[in-house]
Amino acid sequence: MPMPSRDGGLHPRHHHYGSHSPWSQLLSSPMETPSIKGLYYRRVRKVGALDASPVDLKKEILINVGGRRYLLPWSTLDRFPLSRLSKLRLCRSYEEIVQLCDDYDEDSQEFFFDRSPSAFGVIVSFLAAGKLVLLQEMCALSFQEELAYWGIEEAHLERCCLRKLLRKLEELEELAKLHREDVLRQQRETRRPASHSSRWGLCMNRLREMVENPQSGLPGKVFACLSILFVATTAVSLCVSTMPDLRAEEDQGECSRKCYYIFIVETICVAWFSLEFCLRFVQAQDKCQFFQGPLNIIDILAISPYYVSLAVSEEPPEDGERPSGSSYLEKVGLVLRVLRALRILYVMRLARHSLGLQTLGLTVRRCTREFGLLLLFLAVAITLFSPLVYVAEKESGRVLEFTSIPASYWWAIISMTTVGYGDMVPRSVPGQMVALSSILSGILIMAFPATSIFHTFSHSYLELKKEQEQLQARLRHLQNTGPASECELLDPHVASEHELMNDVNDLILEGPALPIMHM
C-alpha cells in the first residue's frame, strides 16, 4: 500500500495487518465502539520493532492504522479541516489526543488508530490524489462507517461508487422494514393466552401445524396435497363447463348427465374449500387479522359465488330431481355469471404451497415503485406517439383504423409492448417511421425497470428459500432432541430460551454459509 514519505512522496514504511473495525449490527445505526486507551500501542509494540525516530509535528504527522504507519504532511489535510486528523493538530494535551485516537506514543510522537488499514489506504490516496472510490473487497456500508469515522463526506465519492452506496442503503432500509414487520408479528403472537398445557391448546397447535406448515409431518403433507388436488379439479371443472355443448344446454335451461356431474364435482370442491377455510379461521390467533390476509380474502371471493347462486335461485331442486348447476345462474343475469367466473381465483390458493408464487407476491409488493415508474414511462410514451401516428396517417390521406387520437392509444400500447396484434397498421411512410420509434422506445422503457424487478425477485426467492430451510432444520432438530415435551414440538414459543439459542446455533452450523456483511 503506498504511503506518504517525509518529503511528500509515497513509500512503504511498515506492513503489519492489525485488527479491523468491529462488526456493526445489521439493522441498527452505526455506533462507534469505545476503545480501551493504552492497550493498542502495547499490542503493536509486541509485534516488531518500529522506527521510533520522532517527527516534527509542526510539518507532518505520523499515524499508525491497523499496524501500518503513515507519514503525512499537515498541508495534505488543509482541504479537510473537519476531518479527524486535522483536529489532532489543535490538541494541546494528552487527554485531548486520546479523545480522537486510540493511543498516542509521546516518545515517537505516533498516533494509533484501531481501524481498517485497507480503507484508510484508500482515504490516503484520496488525500493525495483527490479521487475517492469504494473498495471491492469491503462492504460499502463498512466503508461508509470508515468515512464517517475519519470525517470524510460521502459526497467526495465518485459518482458510480456513490450510486452503489445508495443502493446498499436502500437495501438496508428494506431489511430494517422487514425486521420491524417480523418483530410486530412476533409480538402479536406472544400476546395470545397461555393455554398450551390444556388439551384444547394442544389440539389448536396440532391443527395450526397441519393447515399452515406442510413440512410439519404426515398430516400437514396430506392436507396440502388434498388442497392442491381440489384446486386442480376446480380449474379443470371450470374449463369443461365452458364447452359449447354444455353452454348451449345452459342457455336453454336444460341439464344433461355431464352437467349434473360437473355440479357434483363443484359441490364437493366447494365443500372442501369451506371446510379448509373454517379450519384456518378456528386456529387463527387473531380473528380480525385473519380476514385481512390476502389469501383469505381470495378464499372468500372464490367460495361465495357458489352460495350466492344457491341463495338467489328461485327454483330450488325438489326431492328426487337432479339439481341443475346452470339453473342457479339462469335468472340472476350477468352479475352471477361474473361471480361464477371468480372460481378461477382458486388457482391463487396454490400460493400457500408454492414458493415461486410466494416469491412473485413478495416481489410485487416490494417493487411497487418500479411498477409505478414503468406505468409512468408507458403513459408518457403513449401520449407522445398516439398523436404523431394519427397526424401522420391523416396527412397522408390514408386514415383507415386511426380515426382519432384516443383510438390510437390502443395501437401505441400494443406496439410499445411488442405485442403487435395487427388490427391497426400504419400505411404511410411517416406513420411507419413513428411506429419504428414507438417499438424501439417500448423495448428500452420495458428494459429499464425490468432489471431492478428481476434483481428483487432473485433476492426474494433466496430469502424465502433460506427461511424455509431454516424452519425445516429447526423442526428436524426439535424432533431429534428426543421426548422433550409435546408442547415444545408443536409450539416453539414455549421452548426455553436456552434451547432456542441452541437451535439458532445449529441452524448457523447446518445451513449454507452466507457472506458476512460488515456495517
UniProtKB/Swiss-Prot annotation:
A single MF term (Gene Ontology): transmembrane transporter binding
Region (Disordered): 1-25
Key words, A-Z: Cell membrane, Ion channel, Ion transport, Membrane, Potassium, Potassium channel, Potassium transport, Transmembrane, Transmembrane helix, Transport, Voltage-gated channel
Ranges of the Extracellular topological domain: 241-261, 315-328, 391-405, 426-432
Subcellular location: Cell membrane
Intramembrane segments: 406-417, 418-425
Cysteine-cysteine disulfides: none
Selectivity filter, short sequence motif: residues: 418-423
Cellular component terms per the entry's GO annotation: membrane; nucleoplasm; plasma membrane; voltage-gated potassium channel complex
Protein's membrane topology: Multi-pass membrane protein
GO BP terms in the entry: action potential; potassium ion transmembrane transport; protein homooligomerization; regulation of potassium ion transmembrane transport; regulation of potassium ion transport
Gene3D superfamilies for this protein: 1.10.287.70, Potassium Channel Kv1.1, Chain A, Voltage-gated potassium channels. Chain C
Domain characteristics, as noted in the entry: The transmembrane segment S4 functions as a voltage-sensor and is characterized by a series of positively charged amino acids at every third position. Channel opening and closing is effected by a conformation change that affects the position and orientation of the voltage-sensor paddle formed by S3 and S4 within the membrane. A transmembrane electric field that is positive inside would push the positively charged S4 segment outwards, thereby opening the pore, while a field that is negative inside would pull the S4 segment inwards and close the pore.
Quaternary organization: Heterotetramer with KCNB1. Does not form homomultimer.
Family: Belongs to the potassium channel family. G (TC 1.A.1.2) subfamily. Kv6.4/KCNG4 sub-subfamily.
Protein known as: Voltage-gated potassium channel regulatory subunit KCNG4
Phylogenetic lineage: Eukaryota, Metazoa, Chordata, Craniata, Vertebrata
Gene: KCNG4
